Amino acid sequence: MPRRTDLRHVLVIGSGPILIGQAAEFDYSGTQACRVLRAEGLTVTLINSNPATIMTDPEYADYTYVEPITPDFVERVIAQQAERGNKIDALLATLGGQTALNTAVALSENGVLERYDVELIGADFDAIQRGEDRQRFKDIVTKVGGESAKSRVCFTMEEVRETVGELGLPVVVRPSFTMGGLGSGMAYSAEDVERMAGHGLASSPSANVLIEESIFGWKEYELELMRDRHDNVVVVCSIENFDPMGVHTGDSVTVAPAMTLTDREYQTMRDLGIAILREVGVATGGCNIQFAVNPKDGRLIVIEMNPRVSRSSALASKATGFPIAKIAAKLAIGYTLDEILNDITKETPACFEPTLDYVVVKAPRFAFEKFPGADATLTTTMKSVGEAMSLGRNFIEALGKVMRSLETGRAGFWTAPDPIATVDEVLENLRTPTDGRLYDIEFALRLGASVEQVAEASGVDPWFVDQIAGLVALRTELLDAPVLDGTLLRRAKNSGLSDRQIAALRPELAGEVGVRALRQRLGIHPVFKTVDTCAAEFEAKTPYHYSSYELDPAAESEVAPQAERPKVLILGSGPNRIGQGIEFDYSCVHAATTLSEAGFETVMINCNPETVSTDYDTADRLYFEPLTFEDVLEIYYAESASGAGGPGVAGVIVQLGGQTPLGLAERLEQAGVPIVGTSPKAIDLAEDRGAFGEVLRTAGLPAPRFGLATTFDQARRIAADIGYPVLVRPSYVLGGRGMEIVYDEQTLEGYITRATQLSPEHPVLVDRFLEDAIEIDVDALCDGTEVYIGGIMEHIEEAGIHSGDSACALPPVTLGRSDIESVRRATEAIAHGVGVVGLLNVQYALKDDVLYVLEANPRASRTVPFVSKATAVPLAKACARIMLGASIAQLREEGVLAATGDGATTARNAPVAVKEAVLPFHRFRKADGAQIDSLLGPEMKSTGEVMGIDHDFGSAFAKSQTAAYGSLPSEGTVFVSVANRDKRSLVFPVKRLADLGFKVLATEGTAEMLRRNGIPCDEVRKHFEEPGAGRPARSAVEAIRAGDVAMVINTPYGNSGPRIDGYEIRSAAVSMNIPCITTVQGASAAVQGIEASLRGDIGVMSLQELHSELGN
């Protein structure tokens, strides 16, 4: 049957900002859905608050609303479309993660969908409830003959205690309707139960938690299934978790297809999965079901299901080449599986289940170094911030590739010094899962532990441990062989070992370069295989490749000759991490699409399964490979060979994928690879403070005084000369890694000890820190002659808070025309001085009317997508064209850039866009269960961002806060406790809050100052003060935890007692999920946002409408 003809207009809800537990995989899913629906002739309206996504580009929907994803704002969008005669017929919420699903449930429950006659498609309200509600899902499992863990849904702490008494400790606590395992965990004691169930009841939208028997240590599996309205069901992929139950699947290494299932177990799982899917009632879309198997007796239970496209769906799509989100969207509008053609073979229908003749391994990327004090134990609450995926012809090859894809500083086994430990100590470590468990398993085996001992200690299946044991045996062979011959080297490469790993074992080969030279002499190169969904039964029409070192020297590569068009290789950004997220993938995708249109053949290299760039139809060719020098060079050789006789490889783009490809630029150029755009030498010049300082001196541009130090003595002398506070940081980092504001010599000494370990080959930078300065961010283009200012952003927080964590406004809200003109002149001088061809990001600080240059990055920045959305100018597309020879004048003529003016000449009535960072503090706790500090500083900690856009700053800021944190309060009590230096600045914002009807609560010193300024307030004591002696009975922390505070304003003190008090206050605010503002500027912005909300004139506006207003 063809698609439903009664559907003309579909609303798609995106997933909002990148969060731990809900990341870029939903940008990938939503982008696919929007493309499919529009291709089918449907009108598509999209709501998503995340400007960094491809799906919020205006060309992917007819009406794109970058607005908060709340029931209220979604209703405003539905109403606006209805008022304009564009009635929305259906809502597709299964492709936007838990955020979209929860919003759809709320819209259904509050009657909005019924009032506007909007149908839920993909999964209806009842199906969502049956799949998401723990008790209803458990009843369904029982009904179809399956078994669940013994459990009970509890709504109160009394019910929780009663259930724990029946089941016995330990138990697992799981809230309903949350994502990434938020609020869940293992409770070993009564105290654990009280704490975790309390958090769980607070974090569950339905205010209930599931208390279940512990199945920790069992083997975990997942099935990805799809069903159409004719009841056809396919199992797309089976996935096995390397780690046992107890580690969230998002934090586990996972393998596809499942490796250790017996055929009988798989068939049982498959039958159960299909029966559950039918009973839940997901009739037109995909779902993910998780199972656990007891390795001792084979008992199989069903854990849970997601009645939507999930994180695992993105992984399964990339692993198999079966586009789950795309097919789910087609099923939702009425197609059946047998009517949908497989994109890769162009012959088989989607009802053919994919067959894999390779192994896929996904590994998580963590960022514990960003959160000092956070407990790094892996639990049922997800903590990883990104992931990498690799494909190989066997498990151990894929494992080796994925380990070097993670970019943690270790390129797999044997590339870092071993810890000093005994075999018993390592085995004991393995009993507590951490992010270093793969290395611990290999080390324990190398120290003499048996496969059985390691499997028992770690809970990892003996089959996986045995695979790593085989690698340990191969290591011994590599160390002991008198000569490294072709047979042994080929075996090592077939086992996933990199040249760098082999070089670490054979010092006589003089490093990675020597190993590569030996391989070339022996004719050992990878062959590139194709992902074809059918184990080569049909020919693949889509070039989606992975490398493998086959044992058979005669094995042939499957890269088809392509000699017609010049090729451009685009290096992606690798796994998401704090400091390098999907903003960089966004730029890579734009480069691929625009260069294809301009007549180039685009080749994407990346290893991140969450992203749009690794979709098989984003670039003309995709290599799912690690972004290392060795792997990229082999792809370059393969592409050069496949293009023989034609124009060949025009160049490699390293400027768009963040620090990862930039770090490869110099070595690639030395190996003869043509780098397009800004040269590696110019990139190095901008990073080298001495050389960059010379550029600034020549241009007459001031910069904060600084010095370079390799010892503490040097750093001490520089700091004493410049004057404290100073900003210290290593060079060549992204996301402010290792950056600190230092107020005294003692702290400086501790920092230098750590920092020199962090980056031994580069000196530490010691800069004067400009307190109370306005920070300014600029994105610009340069074609070598002309400079085009893309956008000038004014940070809301003062300089000193990492730009990635600071909210910012575009156009600037307090800068004058002369300030903007100074910024333009400085940016032009830097672009020409460095030699930029492509994108440039410059950060400035404005203090006492002097514009200081903080740093310049000749690459795409994380603000490029935000600026592009706010100004209607596709900066990444323009950059890609410039790198391959187009001029700014030419791009103005073509309409890619504004015909006149640029981002520094915005109209006076232009709407204001505010970007706000989204921070993951609620995910991380200390080992004792305490919250980590939410104080911002020069090291980046945010995982994602949102955008608010409106006709004035207050309204735009209010939207950004609603999108990021669930809105600013409109009434209630505001608690204020600030450092002495901030008291004068905060009088007016707090006075305005009091005038708006808020009650004010403050600690003694702040209360006294507020009363002197005519602001009535109640007093509470500081957390570390005892009650009595004239002090109030309640402390600030007690008031917050009691739910009596709607917002906190707390600026940090020095390093004394009050600083500790500030930590407790901020931690309490995070745990109660209320706004916590830590800067004076943030407080002023919040007041403007609250005023705008209370006025009630905040509307919604599509990007298409906004861009037509801007004249683009």
Swiss-Prot record:
Binding annotation for Mg(2+) 2: E304, N306
SUPFAM superfamilies (alphabetical): Carbamoyl phosphate synthetase, large subunit connection domain (SSF48108), Glutathione synthetase ATP-binding domain-like (SSF56059), Methylglyoxal synthase-like (SSF52335), PreATP-grasp domain (SSF52440)
Region (Oligomerization domain): 408-559
Chain sites annotated for binding Mg(2+) 3: Q843, E855
A biological process term (GO) from this entry: glutamine metabolic process
UniProt pathway annotation: Amino-acid biosynthesis; L-arginine biosynthesis; carbamoyl phosphate from bicarbonate: step 1/1; Pyrimidine metabolism; UMP biosynthesis via de novo pathway; (S)-dihydroorotate from bicarbonate: step 1/3
Residues involved in ATP 1 binding: R134, R174, G180, G181, E213, I215, E220, G246, V247, H248, Q290, E304
Enzyme Commission number: 6.3.4.16, 6.3.5.5
Disulfide bonds: none
The MGS-like domain, residue ranges: 966-1112
Region annotated Carboxyphosphate synthetic domain, chain positions: 1-407
A GO CC term attached to the entry: cytoplasm
Binding, Mn(2+) 3: Q843, E855
Residue span(s) of domain ATP-grasp: 138-333, 693-884
Sites where the protein binds Mn(2+) 4: E855, N857
Keyword entries, A-Z: Amino-acid biosynthesis, Arginine biosynthesis, ATP-binding, Ligase, Magnesium, Manganese, Metal-binding, Nucleotide-binding, Pyrimidine biosynthesis, Repeat
Keyword Ribonucleoprotein set for record: no
Catalysis: reaction(s): hydrogencarbonate + L-glutamine + 2 ATP + H2O = carbamoyl phosphate + L-glutamate + 2 ADP + phosphate + 2 H(+)
NCBIfam families: CPSaseII_lrg, PRK05294.1, PRK12815.1
Alphabetical list of PANTHER family matching this protein: CARBAMOYL-PHOSPHATE SYNTHASE [AMMONIA], MITOCHONDRIAL, CARBAMOYLTRANSFERASE FAMILY MEMBER
Function: Large subunit of the glutamine-dependent carbamoyl phosphate synthetase (CPSase). CPSase catalyzes the formation of carbamoyl phosphate from the ammonia moiety of glutamine, carbonate, and phosphate donated by ATP, constituting the first step of 2 biosynthetic pathways, one leading to arginine and/or urea and the other to pyrimidine nucleotides.
Protein name, UniProt field: Carbamoyl phosphate synthase large chain
Gene: carB
